């Protein structure tokens, strides 16, 4: 069959070809297919004759070989950074500069990068340079200067080593010698001056009163007494204007202003999985301060919702419903402002057990706010790896490009909307999962730079969103910020106790909201890498599998997804569970597609496709930090001690203390099943109960380090 003249073949412009090894470095090779302009045979060398009509009926292509560095030693990576072909591999430099600190310190990299400077000439002696020796024509130095310029521009915080700033001083000295008066030299000089002036101001001035996290927590001496509840209710009422006294627009705009300022200051390096996952290790208290600030703000907003709704137990149901409705309207306004961070924080609080179980209060909520609440909750549904929230964020990011394309010639360009401000936790989880799935080093002590490229794909999205957040035009409103700071925060125990005082368990709806079990870590890892193979536009893993029944410090609570109910009816209540009781989980998972794990890993059964020889179980630790789960693959050969050690490793508890813990299976009805120390867990566990397990310290053993999410 003949092909229509002038019609292009439907071939992929870039096709994988394989790998090549050269001098110990591994390259990925692909073939790039490009259109080529071919001159008609009738056209002379001068181009005076018109091209032949026959020439326009053919499309000419040329295929070029493209090599990108996949793995190499540090010296080779530095050489590629300086002398590599940036047109052929444009992502190498930004990926390297954003992730290099995972495998080499800044000072060490500068030692590789900066060539030694010649000694200064004796006084009165002038050294004449030939054209070859002239620095302006020295290709190597110009390449190094270009790299330093990009480094100073995109990652200036890498050179902040207080108080000496020795790394930045070395860069400034080199640029003053290699490129005096250049933009790069001026940038280094200006950056060093800014760092020194900032240090002087910190020494001379008192630290400003900046709100950096959750306000104080209300406490009572005897939580079971009625007098204590009355005192607690009185203590929870803040002095001065309360947050809900302001309009919906004002509160939503101030929350957006705080979120965008914190998100714009996030350092990309702190988001890397190898950095963020170590934040709770001993000696890492000050690690990732910019990311911690966003987490603290998220938890503060969630705490404000809990405090304002539960902080006045004496309110009647219609009055409490008005507070619920206002928070729903604030959440809707955050959605209109494209602030997904505060939107998720508000929804997480409204969906937490202490608020969600208030049947009478939800029953007094009007139909329209209730419908809005259900629609907003669908944004962060955990189905299909949080596909809904990811697609919405992609659409919001694409808004700017589509508006620019729609501008007609001669018309004024329309101003793109600001933002969006994303929920940073999704990106953090993606990066942690990438760090867990891919090794840092490959065989032969080669740095796995392909892993760094994948991390850069996520960091580049964060960087692009940070730039778009600069287009917001919001002004601070001090009274609202003061009211936000004055809102007392409730502990988890207080939230449950006040909720049960407001509506005793007997008055709660017996039917619990059916919360879909979060997709396991293994499944999301497999899904992400499988989607990357098929080049899906929305292929990135989702949030960690750590459902909680209420707000826990440092990580947002899980969002229960309620079934659709008739308009005007209150959402189903979680029932009368206590603080330590997990919410009931639904096992009706969507049918997953089988995915294959890369890197030669054995196939791990998915939750809906459990094999007869393996199970994916979830293990928590019985402590005061809430129900923090970690997923573990359990095979028919696993004994209790090995399961305990693996679970403690997932929870960042030192391994020598594994003998201090016992493994229990959590059964319905607040019952637990002790797994004997030498038992085969696969056969000792109850096959009909939910596969939730708990580690509990043996009696008489010493206290261990606190456990926190990683």
From Swiss-Prot:
- Which residue stretches does the UniProt record annotate as biased composition, category Pro residues? 568-577
Gene3D superfamilies associated with the record:
Phosphatidylinositol 3-kinase Catalytic Subunit, Chain A, domain 1, Ras guanine-nucleotide exchange factors catalytic domain, Son of sevenless (SoS) protein Chain: S domain 1
Gene Ontology annotations of biological process type: Ras protein signal transduction
Q: Which residues form the N-terminal Ras-GEF domain?
A: 65-200
Biased amino acid composition, Acidic residues:
198-207, 397-407
Q: Which UniProt keywords apply?
A: Guanine-nucleotide releasing factor, Phosphoprotein
- Residue positions of the PTM Phosphoserine? 52, 508, 512, 555, 569, 573, 591, 601
Q: Name one GO molecular function term.
A: guanyl-nucleotide exchange factor activity
Q: Supply the SMART domains for this chain.
A: RA (SM00314), RasGEF (SM00147), RasGEFN (SM00229)
Coiled-coil spans are none
State the protein's purpose.
Guanine nucleotide exchange factor (GEF) for Ral-A. Potential effector of GTPase HRas and Ras-related protein M-Ras. Negatively regulates Elk-1-dependent gene induction downstream of HRas and MEKK1.
Q: Please give the PANTHER family that the UniProt record associates with this protein.
A: GUANINE NUCLEOTIDE EXCHANGE FACTOR, RAL GUANINE NUCLEOTIDE DISSOCIATION STIMULATOR-LIKE 3
Question: How does this chain assemble?
Answer: Interacts with GTP-bound forms of RIT1, HRAS and MRAS.
Copy the domain comment. The Ras-associating domain plays a central role in the activation of Ral-A GDP/GTP exchange activity.
Q: What is this protein called?
A: Ral guanine nucleotide dissociation stimulator-like 3
